[in-house]
């Protein structure tokens, strides 16, 4: 995403403290159960997919085919990973 933002002439967030400030996914601490870890990953992916879909709508309205295509590809990959993690959990 950062490269795409640069291509469009803007400056992406580029340090960890910026990411922490704008993130909607909070850090999980001291998770020792494997299944719980996978549940946390799944919940995080659902947040990411929702945000990517919002961006997909925005890029479509803006006529930005490059970013739209990139978001579509990212969503496809995340959905596949969600399916695999759900399969792992027996869902």
Regions found by a protein language model. Name each.
Residues 1, 5-12, 89:
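Leucine-rich amphipathic alpha-helices with coiled-coil/heptad-repeat character
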Residues 69-91:
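Short, contiguous alpha-helical
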């Amino acid at each position: 995403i950062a490269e795409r933002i640069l291509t469009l002439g803007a400056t992406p967030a580029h340090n960890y403290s910026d990411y922490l400030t704008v993130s909607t996914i909070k850090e999980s601490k001291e998770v020792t159960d494997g299944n719980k870890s996978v549940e946390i990953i799944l919940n995080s992916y659902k947040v990411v997919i929702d945000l990517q879909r919002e961006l997909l709508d925005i890029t479509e309205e803006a006529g930005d085919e490059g970013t739209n295509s990139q978001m579509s590809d990212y969503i496809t990959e995340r959905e596949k990973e969600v399916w695999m993690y759900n399969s792992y959990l027996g869902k």
